Design a protein with these regions (language model features):
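Terminal cytosolic tails of multi-pass membrane transporters
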Residues: 1-21, 65-67, 336-364, 369-375, ...
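Helix-loop-helix module between adjacent transmembrane segments
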Residues: 10-30, 110-205, 275-283, 289-292, ...
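C-terminal membrane-solvent junction of multi-pass transporters and transport-like membrane proteins
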Residues: 13, 70-87, 487-592
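Membrane-interface loop-to-helix entry segments
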Residues: 13-25, 43-72, 78, 139-167, ...
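Loop-to-transmembrane helix boundary motifs in multi-pass membrane proteins
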Residues: 15, 148-156, 163-167, 316, ...
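Hydrophobic alpha-helical segments and their helix-loop junctions in multi-pass secondary transporters
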Residues: 29-38, 62-68, 167-170, 174, ...
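Transmembrane helix-loop boundary segments of multi-pass membrane transporters
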Residues: 37-50, 104-114, 174-192, 210-219, ...
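Membrane-interface helix-loop-helix modules in multi-pass membrane proteins
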Residues: 71-138, 280-283, 302-334, 344-376, ...
Length: 592
């Protein structure tokens, strides 16, 4: 029996590898065809737009082909996702979370602050929290907390916190993809928002977590190629500045440029940066879309290996993105510094007309407007401009502008646009699926006493997907929020509302009352601090507000536990089974 099982497993893995090779070859051939069109002189606009649209079509097709009506596939990808691919997919989700703060990768340290918090949180999620979820057999972090604290009030609170943070991430991912499609291909914003919303639904709707994870793995591959190809091309032509990362000469110069342009914010001091690290790490460690890859693996060991793979690939692709941003900043500065405002590269005027680059503090449509804007700042006609007078909007623009600034061709521009769009779709679909799981499984199934029909649960899931996708579409069209604000808010909600209760879950004296007090205290502390802060525009402000919620919620929960009855046999038994017991400690879900 064991030999037959091993042979069957080997056959299934071979079939899986063959399918992955086919998908990878399809993407590579499509991108190679775009490069060929660029070489033979096809219109630049067509060559630059073809790869992004193919990427959207390819990811949507991949998600649709994985459709299933089985609960085990829809909610957990059949518990059959190999660790290497699960980690690769999770890297795409985490990288998309980092894109709104992408300039910090090239312009600041990784050890502390928002970037450091992301890596610490990913390590905690991948090496401990995720494997714990997989060991216990739950579908999400909210289900684990609901099993530990069983009152209806705490269940509603946990499900609401997961749904809110996941919805914010879905909107952020959609906005990242829409912005890339609009800014780098010139697409109409309404059309781009509709296309991204439809693609997100097609990926997450038919196949659930299976479609989301495999699409995210493909997105990670596209991102590796998209960010890595320009760096490789510059290296082959000996045009890549040395020391682009880790404090080299070019890295230091790029960091100064980014700071002078205002692309990277001014540091707020070591205490604030340290607080940001803690809050962001706790937010990542308890974020449902980040933990979803662990749920889809074979067992706890596979989940831990997936965490290691996710950390490795996140670092690798983040290094490529940091090098690309730094190279783009240096190329842009060298192309424009010393030039009069009426003789800047045409690409700068085009970007300024779309609001992506300011010239002398103004958005201009051509040389004459640039000359007038600089004259208002005291520049004489024909006087050369300082590099600080040409200010890009953000790090995403610098990523997309590298091929033009370094004259790598339209195909490279399309490849980077594809990478940004693919990462945005990975985050959007992961957020959609996590929110739908919270409502369709954690709420509808568990709260109804585990008696609901699978078909009804999946129907509720898909209705939730449509509602959240519609909200993301409206957010993308109106442009009311920025991706950075949405991601920071999601991390703050997750850290303030879930982290204290997760810590209490390991304390035998904590019961339903303590969890409810911690949950409510975290929410009150977070939203009160946000109200005092007004309209926060930096992730550090959201992190400080989250830390206020964590402190209040954790403190109240601890105080309540110390004043409660110390002997809680049920809590002690649950913790013992959770940490030292066999896997699948919860009653298995029917269909799973």
């Amino acid at each position: 029996m064991s030999d037959r099982s091993a042979e069957q497993a080997a056959l299934e893995r071979a079939n899986l590898d063959a399918r992955i090779a086919f998908v990878a070859a399809s993407f590579l051939l499509a991108y190679a065809f775009a490069a060929l069109l660029d070489r033979v002189g096809a219109p630049e606009r067509f060559v630059g737009a073809a790869p992004p649209y193919f990427t959207i079509l390819g990811l949507a097709t991949l998600g649709f082909l994985l459709h299933s009506m089985r609960a085990s596939v829809y909610y957990t990808a059949g518990r059959a996702l190999p660790a290497a691919y699960a980690g690769f997919a999770n890297a795409a989700v985490v990288l998309a979370l980092m894109l709104p703060f992408g300039a910090r990768l090239a312009g600041g340290g990784w050890a502390i602050g928002a970037v450091g918090g992301v890596f610490i949180g990913l390590a905690a999620a991948g090496l401990y929290v995720g494997p714990l979820l997989r060991k216990t057999g739950v579908f999400s972090i909210s289900e684990l907390l609901c099993a530990r604290f069983t009152s209806a009030a705490t269940r509603v609170g946990f499900i609401g916190a997961v749904a809110l943070s996941s919805t914010l991430l879905a909107a952020a991912g959609s906005l990242i993809a829409v912005n890339a499609l609009v800014e780098l291909t010139g697409a109409n914003r309404g059309f781009a928002a509709f296309l991204i919303a439809a693609a997100s639904l097609i990926i997450a709707g038919p196949g659930g977590l299976s479609g989301v994870m495999w699409a995210a793995a493909a997105a990670a591959g596209v991102a590796t190629l998209g960010f890595g190809w320009p760096i490789a091309a510059l290296s082959l032509h000996d045009a890549l500045p040395s020391g682009l990362i880790f404090g080299g000469e070019a890295s230091t110069e790029a960091a100064k440029l980014l700071e002078n342009w205002g692309v990277t914010p001014t540091p707020m001091g070591l205490p604030v940066e340290f607080a940001t690290t803690i809050a962001v790490a706790l937010g990542i460690a308890t974020l449902a879309p980040v933990l979803a890859a662990s749920v889809a693996t074979w067992d706890g060991r596979s989940a831990r290996r997936a965490g290691v793979a996710a950390l490795f690939w996140t670092v690798v692709i983040a290094l490529l993105a940091a090098a690309a941003i730094a190279a783009s900043a240096l190329s842009l500065a060298r192309a424009s510094a010393g030039q009069p405002p009426e003789r800047l590269p045409q690409a700068i005027y085009q970007a300024s007309e779309r609001g992506l680059v300011s010239v002398c503090g103004a958005y201009v449509r051509g040389p004459s407007e640039a000359q007038r804007a600089c004259a208002a700042k005291g520049y004489a006609p024909g006087a050369p401009l300082a590099a600080a007078e040409i200010r890009p909007l953000d790090g995403d623009f610098l990523l997309g502008a590298l091929p033009q600034a370094a004259e790598l061709g339209a195909a490279s521009s399309g490849l980077i646009a594809s990478a940004l769009i693919a990462l945005g779709l990975a985050l959007a679909t992961a957020g959609l699926q996590a929110c739908a799981t919270a409502f369709g499984h954690d709420a509808l199934y568990r709260l109804r006493g585990e008696i609901d029909l699978t078909s009804r649960r999946l129907a509720v899931n898909r209705v939730t997907l449509v509602v959240v996708s519609t909200l993301a579409y409206v957010t993308a069209v109106t442009g009311v929020f920025t991706p950075g604000a949405l991601v920071a808010a999601a991390l703050a909600v997750s850290a303030a509302c879930l982290a204290p209760s997760l810590a209490l879950a390991f304390w035998p004296r904590a019961g339903d009352r303590e969890a409810l007090v911690a949950l409510c205290g975290g929410a009150v502390g977070l939203f009160s601090a946000l109200a005092v802060a007004g309209s926060p525009s930096r992730v550090e402000i959201y992190a400080l507000c989250a830390l206020a919620g964590i402190t209040l919620g954790g403190g109240l929960g601890l105080l309540s536990g110390l004043t409660s009855r110390s002997d809680k046999p049920a809590a002690r038994a649950f913790i013992t089974r959770m940490l030292r017991g066999d896997a699948q400690m919860l009653q298995p879900d029917k269909g799973a």
